[in-house]
Amino acid sequence: EVPSRGLGDVYKRQRLGLTPDTASTQVISRDRHADYVQTLALIGASLDRFSTEIRNLQRTDVLEVEESFAKGQKGSSAMPHKRNPIRSERISGLARVLRSYVVAALENVALWHERDISHSSTERMMLPDCSVTLHFMLREMTAVVAGLGVYPGNMLRNMNVYGGVVFSQRVLLGLVDAGMSREDAYRVVQRNAHSAWNNDGGDFRRNLEADPEVTAKLSPCLLYTSPSPR
């Protein structure tokens, strides 16, 4: 139940968990408003980080995860095969809007003799807009996560591209454990990895198995390039 008008401020403070400012002039210091806006922008940046990763993982050549795609939905008017991560793209775009408000919030901190109201026009737009924007972004990310498609088979395929070249560190550490100096191990592994990378259809695992410097220390190399823990 909303209290009578005379107790309205008390009610709002209690609902929002706010306390009165113990030292203020005509206006409350705007550093706390700036802190609020920066916090919203930071949350938005985290959502942007998640959505950017989803967008990259949804690329056609990667396709390890994917936003839900409704029947009849269009990803591109020109390319019918596309299934664009529209929600994640929207989140990344709105995160930029949130970050743009941080500058305005910080510029509002310095007021003439701690009491002019130049901040007011900015805050009338900034505070409601950044609050509603973040709320919308959170709703969008919730929908993304709820409908996210995950493709373990494609993850395994990508890890095994070029014969498991992504496991080069495991080979490096295996050679070092077997007695090879780290500098020599790095040189040997890099040579075999780059050979697989630079040659179409190259195979890191086969390169290692054919390298006498490797086989003199490790056998079989498959133990160090397998995706499963050893």
Give the role of each language-model region.
Residues 79-226, 230:
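Glycine-rich cofactor/substrate-binding loops
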Residues 4-6, 15, 70-74, 177:
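Short glycine/serine/threonine-biased micro-segments
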Residues 13-25:
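A short, charged helix-loop
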Residues 11-13, 172:
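Conserved protein kinase catalytic domain
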